[in-house]
C-alpha cells in the first residue's frame, strides 16, 4: 500500500473530487490557510480569455500543490510551493469563464499550512503605460460616444495619429489605431524596434469603446513601414518568438485599413486581397523628400535592354539589364558606368533608371550607363556576400562583355558599383578585390555584420556577428586603395544583442576605419529601417557625390546631405 507523496496529476484529480465550498480569490487579499490531513481548499476566479494570472503561493514547511482547472474542468496547470520558492506563479486563461484553483498537501496524509497573496490579473497584451506615453487625444476618450466623435474627427485615413510633444522638438507622439469589433481580442503592431519584448507591441483597448491604440515616441524625420496583426496569438513577457509562432503571426498580419499609404510594389503579380499586399507606410511630417525617385512629366527617359548572361565561372545564367541614358550614342565620349545588383527590384522598387533619368536631366550627374545584375534563383545569399568567385565573375566576365558592346568608360574613377543590404557588401568586396575596375562604392545599409562561413563548401552556414569587423579588417590590413565610398545606414538598424553585429554599428565602424586610412567617405544615417522605402531615396544621395565630379558637381543634392570628410 502506497503511503508516500502522490504524483501531481493524481493529487490534482483527487483534489477536484474532494474540494470544499469554493472561495472567491480577490486582488490585494491574502489567504492564510491550514489544511487538515487529506483535505484541500477550492478557490475560483472569473477570467476573460487570454488574461494572465499571477500570485504567490508559500508553504509553512510542507509542500502544497496548487492545481488550475479551466471552466470545462480540465487540468490546465499545477504548481508546487516548494518549487516556486516564493516567486510568483503565472498562468494564462485559454478560455473565458470560472476557473478553479485547488490547493492540497503533496503528502496526502499530512496537514499543511500555506499562504496565497499578491494576486494580479492582467491582459498579457496590455502592459501598464505611463500617462506620458499615451496620446493626449486618446486620453480624452472614455465612452463609445466620444469614440464615435474621434473616428469622425480623424476620418477614414487618420492612422497613424501624429501629435506634438511638449518640450521635445525631435519626437512626436505617434499612435497606431484599430477600430475594433465584437470579434477583436488583441492587435499586434509589427513595427521594427517597437520594443525588444513583443508583448509591448500589442495595442491597448479603451474599455467600453471600439478604440484600440499604441502610442510611441518617434523621430519627426522617420520614414518606414509597418503591419498590424488582428487577433495575434496571445504572448506573455519573455516569450521567444520561434519560427512556429512567427508563422502564426505572419498568416494574420495585414496593412493598416486606416492608412491608404502602402508599399504595393508587386500589385500586378500578387493575386491576394489588397489588404494583404505590401506594407503600410509611416512618413513623419519632416521625413526628407525623395525628389529623384518619381517619374517626372517632360523628363526624357532612358532605354532598358534586357538579356540573359551565362557565366562559366559561376556555372549559371542570370538576367541582366543595361540602362542607356537619353540620347545615348556610340559616338559620344565614353559614358560613366554604374553597376548595381538585384535585377528587377532595382528597376521597379528602388527605381534606379528613373533616378538616373532625373539626375541626368538636372545635370546632377554625368550621363551614365547602368548595368543592373539580376539574381539567380535562391543564390543571392551565396553569391552577394563577399564571394570572391562572384567578384571575379563581375571583373573577368561581365565587364569585359559590356565594354565592347556599349560605350562605357574604362576609367575606374568613373565607375561606381553599388547595392543595398547584401548588395552593398558585394559592391564593397568587389571593389576591394578589383579597384582597377571599380573606383567608387555606393553601399546602402550594407550588411557588414557578415562573417565568412567556417566551412567554405557550405557558404550559407555561418554565425552572424561572429566577426562583425571582418570587412573593416580587410581595409585595415591592406594598403590604401584608389577607392571612394558612400555609406549609409538606418537609425532602426540597431544592435539589440550587444555583440556589435548590427548594420548601423558595423557601418559606423567601417566608416571610421576608412577615414582613418585616408579614404574619401560620404556617410549618412537616415531615420528609417532596413527597407526599400528609404533606399528608393538614398540611392540618389550616393550617386550625386560619387558621380557628380563628372558633371561638375561636388556636393550631395538631396535634402539629406551625406557628410564628406
Q: What is each model feature region?
A:
Residues 34-86, 94-97, 102-109:
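Acidic, Ser/Thr/Pro-rich low-complexity intrinsically disordered segments
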Residues 51-53, 62-67, 112-114, 183-187, ...:
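Short beta-strand/loop motifs in extracellular/secreted proteins, especially
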Residues 21-25, 43, 70, 100-129:
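C-terminal edge strands of extracellular/lumenal beta-sandwich accessory domains
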Residues 41-43, 87-89, 210-214:
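Short strand-edge motifs at loop-to-beta-strand transitions and within beta-strands
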Residues 46, 90-93, 215-220:
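Short, flexible loop/turn segments at beta-strand junctions in immunoglobulin-like
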Amino acid at each position: 500500500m502506497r503511503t508516500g507523496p502522490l504524483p501531481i496529476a493524481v493529487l490534482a484529480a483527487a483534489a477536484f473530487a474532494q474540494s470544499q465550498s469554493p472561495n472567491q480569490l480577490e486582488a490585494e487579499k491574502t489567504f492564510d490557510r491550514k489544511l487538515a490531513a487529506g483535505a484541500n481548499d477550492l478557490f475560483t476566479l472569473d477570467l476573460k480569455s487570454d488574461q494572465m494570472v499571477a500570485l504567490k503561493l508559500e508553504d509553512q514547511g510542507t509542500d502544497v500543490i496548487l492545481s488550475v482547472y479551466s471552466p470545462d474542468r480540465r487540468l490546465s496547470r499545477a504548481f508546487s510551493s516548494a518549487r516556486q520558492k516564493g516567486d510568483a506563479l503565472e498562468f494564462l486563461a485559454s478560455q473565458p469563464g470560472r476557473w478553479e484553483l485547488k490547493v492540497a498537501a503533496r503528502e496526502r496524509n499530512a496537514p499543511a499550512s500555506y499562504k496565497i497573496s499578491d494576486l494580479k490579473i492582467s491582459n498579457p497584451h496590455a502592459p501598464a503605460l505611463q500617462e506620458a506615453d499615451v496620446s493626449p487625444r486618446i486620453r480624452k476618450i472614455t465612452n463609445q460616444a466620444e469614440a464615435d466623435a474621434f473616428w469622425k474627427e480623424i476620418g477614414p485615413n487618420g492612422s497613424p495619429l501624429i501629435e506634438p510633444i511638449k518640450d521635445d522638438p525631435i519626437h512626436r507622439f505617434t499612435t497606431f489605431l484599430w477600430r475594433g469589433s465584437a470579434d477583436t481580442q488583441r492587435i499586434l503592431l509589427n513595427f521594427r524596434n517597437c520594443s525588444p519584448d513583443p508583448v509591448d507591441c500589442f495595442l491597448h483597448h479603451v474599455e467600453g469603446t471600439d478604440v484600440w491604440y499604441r502610442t510611441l515616441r518617434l523621430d519627426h524625420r522617420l520614414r518606414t513601414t509597418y503591419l498590424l496583426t488582428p487577433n495575434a496569438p496571445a504572448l506573455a513577457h519573455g516569450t521567444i518568438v520561434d519560427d512556429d509562432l512567427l508563422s502564426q503571426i505572419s498568416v494574420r498580419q495585414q496593412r493598416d485599413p486606416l492608412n491608404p499609404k502602402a508599399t504595393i510594389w508587386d500589385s500586378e503579380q500578387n493575386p491576394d486581397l489588397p489588404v494583404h499586399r505590401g506594407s503600410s507606410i509611416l512618413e513623419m511630417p519632416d521625413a526628407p523628400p525623395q525628389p529623384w525617385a518619381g517619374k517626372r512629366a517632360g523628363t526624357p527617359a532612358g532605354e532598358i535592354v534586357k538579356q540573359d548572361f551565362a557565366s562559366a565561372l559561376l556555372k549559371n545564367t542570370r538576367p541582366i539589364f543595361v540602362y542607356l541614358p537619353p540620347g545615348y550614342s556610340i559616338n559620344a565620349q565614353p559614358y560613366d558606368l554604374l553597376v548595381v545588383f538585384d535585377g528587377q527590384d532595382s528597376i521597379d522598387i528602388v527605381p534606379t533608371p528613373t533616378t538616373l533619368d532625373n539626375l541626368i536631366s538636372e545635370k546632377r550627374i554625368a550621363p551614365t550607363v547602368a548595368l543592373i545584375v539580376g539574381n539567380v534563383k535562391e543564390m543571392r545569399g551565396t553569391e552577394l556576400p563577399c564571394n570572391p568567385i562572384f567578384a571575379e565573375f563581375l571583373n573577368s566576365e561581365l565587364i569585359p562583355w559590356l565594354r565592347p558592346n556599349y560605350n562605357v568608360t574604362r576609367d575606374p574613377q568613373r565607375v561606381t558599383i553599388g547595392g543595398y543590404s547584401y548588395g552593398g557588401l558585394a559592391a564593397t568586396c568587389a571593389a576591394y578585390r578589383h579597384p582597377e575596375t571599380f573606383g567608387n562604392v555606393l553601399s546602402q545599409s550594407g550588411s557588414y555584420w557578415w562573417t565568412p562561413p567556417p566551412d567554405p563548401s557550405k557558404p550559407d552556414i555561418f554565425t552572424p556577428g561572429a566577426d562583425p569587423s571582418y570587412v573593416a579588417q580587410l581595409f585595415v590590413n591592406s594598403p590604401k586603395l584608389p577607392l571612394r565610398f558612400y555609406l549609409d545606414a538606418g537609425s532602426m538598424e540597431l544592435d539589440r544583442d550587444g555583440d556589435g553585429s548590427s548594420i548601423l554599428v558595423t557601418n559606423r565602424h567601417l566608416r571610421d576605419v576608412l577615414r582613418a586610412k585616408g579614404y574619401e567617405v560620404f556617410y549618412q544615417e537616415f531615420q528609417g529601417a532596413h527597407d526599400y522605402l528609404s533606399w528608393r531615396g538614398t540611392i540618389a544621395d550616393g550617386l550625386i557625390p560619387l558621380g557628380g565630379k563628372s558633371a561638375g558637381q561636388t556636393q550631395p543634392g538631396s535634402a539629406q546631405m551625406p557628410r564628406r570628410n
